[in-house]
Design a protein with these regions (language model features):
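A conserved short coil-to-beta-strand element within the FAD-binding core of flavoproteins
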Residues: 15-29
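An anion/pyrophosphate-binding glycine-rich loop and adjacent beta-alpha core
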Residues: 78, 84-208
Length: 223
């Protein structure tokens, strides 16, 4: 939607600028922002009748997450320090199946389990489908919080991660490759690009990751 307004010259985009602080009047009302040009470090004030902070989550607080690397939570932190209310910060969504990476973690969608993917690791030298054993009524379709806790327990408490690492298998190799491509093509491509292995033939290596921050700056009809 914003691009459409840009084309009509109704919106001006400032790229490579960093939000520094809010501009507050004597009554504590927000009247604009101060931002810094990251090319020349110049500061500039932008006054406005209203300010909308659409700055993403806080995934980088966790080091690595499925969020973009610019999701630092810094804008919300600045607003909080200037008097805004930050609510429900304890509600952090953990996704059970993510691909670890040097820069961030990449989401391996739950649709993989929905289409028949199985999670397992080795126990006593044999494949162990621990979700199916612990939760026989649901198996690999347990809710994401239960799946994430189970994987975390297997790796960190039981020490049964693959090759001693915090990893377990998300296995699609028993499924029809054509159906995998049709229904899961996006995550297959991501995994192949970043790992160099074919999930149709080799199980994917995954671990839970911070995914979404459900809380944030408090908004209501007065804010």
């Amino acid at each position: 939607q914003v691009r459409r307004y840009e084309e009509q010259k109704l919106v001006k985009k400032y790229e490579q600028w960093e939000f520094v602080r809010l501009i507050l009047d004597d009554n504590g009302e927000c009247r604009g922002i101060v931002a810094q040009n990251m090319y020349d470090m110049r500061m500039e004030a932008f006054t406005a009748d209203a300010v909308i902070l659409a700055t993403g989550g806080l995934g980088m607080v966790f080091g690595r997450s499925t969020n973009g690397t610019i999701s630092t939570g810094s804008a919300a932190s600045i607003a909080y320090q200037q008097g805004s209310i930050f609510g429900n910060g304890e509600f952090i969504q953990i996704h059970p199946t993510a691909l670890p990476g040097e820069d961030k973690r990449r989401l391996m969608s739950e649709s993989a389990r929905g289409e028949g993917g199985r999670i397992w690791t080795y126990k006593d030298g044999k494949p162990w489908y621990f979700l199916e054993e612990w939760y026989p009524a649901y198996g690999n379709l347990v809710p994401r919080d239960i799946a994430a806790r189970a994987i975390f327990k297997v790796c960190t408490e039981m020490g049964l991660g693959l090759n001693g690492q915090n990893l377990v298998n998300l296995d699609l190799t028993h499924l029809d490759p054509k159906e995998i491509d049709r229904k899961l093509g996006a995550i297959i491509e991501i995994y192949e690009n970043f790992v160099g292995e074919d999930p149709r033939k080799v199980p994917m290596k995954i671990f839970p990751s911070m995914h979404y921050s459900m809380g944030g700056l408090w908004t209501d009809y007065g804010h």
